């Protein structure tokens, strides 16, 4: 059970600004369709004009807060409608495959959001309502984000495999990738359908070149991103934040070599589509020397949730196993009998773990334990865990850290690329009909 980065962001700022929280996708009921226009049909569901108006108002609120110039109204509406279509297609797939978010999981996520912002639940609710976001809407938004996160984990992240040969090749051919240098980037993505015709491709290339020409003439990057980009971060100016070189797709890593802060790349082509990258800033770059890190020897029992085993039942099952360990049962033997992880054959033994080797939820819980202690059940993107810490040590892990960093970088690269491909394939097989008149 090694690290695949968790995709669930803590979205308090987004919710407070009515910015990026996701609206719940419900099948439209007949009465609402009768009194509202239909903006689009997605498979067997509709997106109403009211939903689209809400999303437009939300985006305008966000752009104003960020001080980002607004794109033309028709462009903004078209961009947001396409995002609603893609979001609805994902949520339909989640429902069809019985993915759910139970109340206990939702309450824990909201508690973490409040805690990370040093608020009580009551203070969080008051802050949201002061800014015009109802508590029920906020809860629905968080539930939707968790659901989309779990869908990505199941369909993409959990299927990513990085081999030792790939790690060796990465280290041999990317000598400067682990130097510690970081880049602050923004980007524009124009998705290209998998089976795009020559005419479609020409139109998309023309769209990318138009965006580039606007940038060359001095137009604001955030405004152009909001007008042209198909990426989820388009309404945030296309901001990717700070990324180390090893976390960048090879296409971006090569492009930033030629850029100085403030400059913009030419139009780039990848399997996901067409890209324009802006280098906002760069920092760091000193190579890391020998590292002594505290490592933890741990075991765990993993219970995965499924259509027939929900979160509450998985947690309850682990509580029962924990009680047996406290009463003298062998953790290793229980792991062999009950754990769904590959480590079960070794009694749940994960070996010596360095910081960053496991997902944050697991690591935080493990770090709070003393040798010999057993945790309460904890949830991660992989399922529910019971963790036992056996020992700790200081270890020179310079070479091991390089390999782990390379493996994590490759995993994130492959996951991001696979997710973009998966989204494109999902969109291509989704029936979509756009409506412009009243229905």
UniProtKB/Swiss-Prot annotation:
<keyword id="KW-0732">Signal</keyword>
<dbReference type="InterPro" id="IPR023034">
    <property type="entry name" value="PPIase_SurA"/>
</dbReference>
<dbReference type="GO" id="GO:0043165">
    <property type="term" value="P:Gram-negative-bacterium-type cell outer membrane assembly"/>
</dbReference>
<dbReference type="InterPro" id="IPR050280">
    <property type="entry name" value="OMP_Chaperone_SurA"/>
</dbReference>
<dbReference type="Pfam" id="PF13616">
    <property type="entry name" value="Rotamase_3"/>
</dbReference>
<protein>
    <recommendedName>
        <fullName>Chaperone SurA</fullName>
        <ecNumber>5.2.1.8</ecNumber>
    </recommendedName>
</protein>
<feature type="domain" description="PpiC 2">
    <location>
        <begin position="293"/>
        <end position="391"/>
    </location>
</feature>
<dbReference type="GO" id="GO:0030288">
    <property type="term" value="C:outer membrane-bounded periplasmic space"/>
</dbReference>
<dbReference type="GO" id="GO:0051082">
    <property type="term" value="F:unfolded protein binding"/>
</dbReference>
<keyword id="KW-0574">Periplasm</keyword>
<keyword id="KW-0677">Repeat</keyword>
<keyword id="KW-0413">Isomerase</keyword>
<dbReference type="Pfam" id="PF00639">
    <property type="entry name" value="Rotamase"/>
</dbReference>
<dbReference type="InterPro" id="IPR015391">
    <property type="entry name" value="SurA_N"/>
</dbReference>
<keyword id="KW-0143">Chaperone</keyword>
<dbReference type="Pfam" id="PF09312">
    <property type="entry name" value="SurA_N"/>
</dbReference>
<dbReference type="GO" id="GO:0050821">
    <property type="term" value="P:protein stabilization"/>
</dbReference>
<keyword id="KW-0697">Rotamase</keyword>
<dbReference type="InterPro" id="IPR000297">
    <property type="entry name" value="PPIase_PpiC"/>
</dbReference>
<comment type="function">
    <text>Chaperone involved in the correct folding and assembly of outer membrane proteins. Recognizes specific patterns of aromatic residues and the orientation of their side chains, which are found more frequently in integral outer membrane proteins. May act in both early periplasmic and late outer membrane-associated steps of protein maturation.</text>
</comment>
<feature type="signal peptide">
    <location>
        <begin position="1"/>
        <end position="27"/>
    </location>
</feature>
<dbReference type="GO" id="GO:0006457">
    <property type="term" value="P:protein folding"/>
</dbReference>
<dbReference type="GO" id="GO:0042277">
    <property type="term" value="F:peptide binding"/>
</dbReference>
<dbReference type="InterPro" id="IPR046357">
    <property type="entry name" value="PPIase_dom_sf"/>
</dbReference>
<dbReference type="GO" id="GO:0003755">
    <property type="term" value="F:peptidyl-prolyl cis-trans isomerase activity"/>
</dbReference>
<dbReference type="InterPro" id="IPR027304">
    <property type="entry name" value="Trigger_fact/SurA_dom_sf"/>
</dbReference>
<dbReference type="InterPro" id="IPR023058">
    <property type="entry name" value="PPIase_PpiC_CS"/>
</dbReference>
<feature type="domain" description="PpiC 1">
    <location>
        <begin position="180"/>
        <end position="281"/>
    </location>
</feature>
């Amino acid at each position: 059970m090694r690290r695949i980065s968790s995709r669930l962001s803590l979205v308090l700022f987004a919710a407070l600004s009515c910015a990026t929280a996701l609206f719940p996708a419900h099948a439209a009921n007949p009465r609402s369709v009768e009194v509202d226009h239909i903006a689009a049909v997605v498979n067997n569901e509709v997106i109403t004009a009211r939903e689209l108006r809400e999303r437009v108002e939300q985006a305008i609120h966000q752009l104003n807060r960020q001080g980002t110039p607004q794109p033309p109204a028709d462009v903004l509406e078209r961009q947001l409608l396409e995002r609603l279509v893609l979001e609805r297609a994902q949520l339909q797939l989640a429902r069809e495959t019985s993915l759910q978010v139970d109340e206990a999981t939702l309450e824990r996520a909201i508690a973490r959001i409040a805690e990370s912002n040093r608020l009580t639940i009551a203070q969080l609710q008051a802050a949201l309502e002061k800014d015009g976001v109802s508590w029920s809407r906020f809860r629905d938004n968080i539930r939707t984000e968790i659901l989309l996160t779990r869908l990505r984990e199941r369909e993409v992240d959990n299927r990513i495999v990085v081999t030792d040969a790939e790690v060796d090749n990465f280290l041999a051919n990317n000598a400067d990738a682990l130097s510690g240098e970081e880049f602050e980037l923004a980007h524009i993505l124009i998705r290209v359908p998998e089976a795009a015709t020559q005419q479609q491709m020409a139109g998309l290339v023309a769209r990318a070149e138009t965006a580039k020409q606007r940038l060359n003439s001095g137009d604001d990057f955030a405004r152009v991103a909001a007008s042209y980009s198909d990426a989820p971060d388009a309404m945030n100016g296309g901001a990717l934040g700070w990324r180390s070189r090893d976390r960048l797709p090879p296409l971006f890593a090569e492009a930033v070599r030629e850029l100085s802060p403030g400059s913009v790349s030419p139009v780039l082509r990848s399997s996901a589509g067409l890209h324009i990258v802006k280098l906002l800033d760069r920092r760091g770059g000193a190579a890391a020397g020998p590292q002594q890190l505290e490592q933890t020897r741990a075991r765990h029992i993993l219970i995965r949730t499924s259509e027939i085993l929900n979160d509450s039942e998985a947690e309850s099952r682990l509580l029962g196993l924990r009680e047996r360990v406290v009463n003298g049962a062998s953790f290793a033997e229980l792991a062999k009998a009950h754990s769904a992880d590959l480590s079960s054959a070794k009694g749940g033994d994960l070996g010596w773990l360095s910081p960053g080797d496991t997902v944050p939820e697991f690591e935080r819980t493990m770090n709070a334990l003393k040798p010999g202690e057993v945790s309460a059940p904890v949830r991660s993107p992989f399922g529910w865990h019971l963790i036992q810490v056996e020992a700790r040590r200081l270890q020179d892990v310079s070479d091991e850290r390089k390999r782990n960093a390379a493996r994590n970088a490759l995993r994130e690269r492959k996951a991001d690329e696979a997710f973009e491909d998966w989204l494109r394939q999902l969109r291509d097989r989704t029936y979509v009909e756009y409506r412009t008149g009243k229905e």
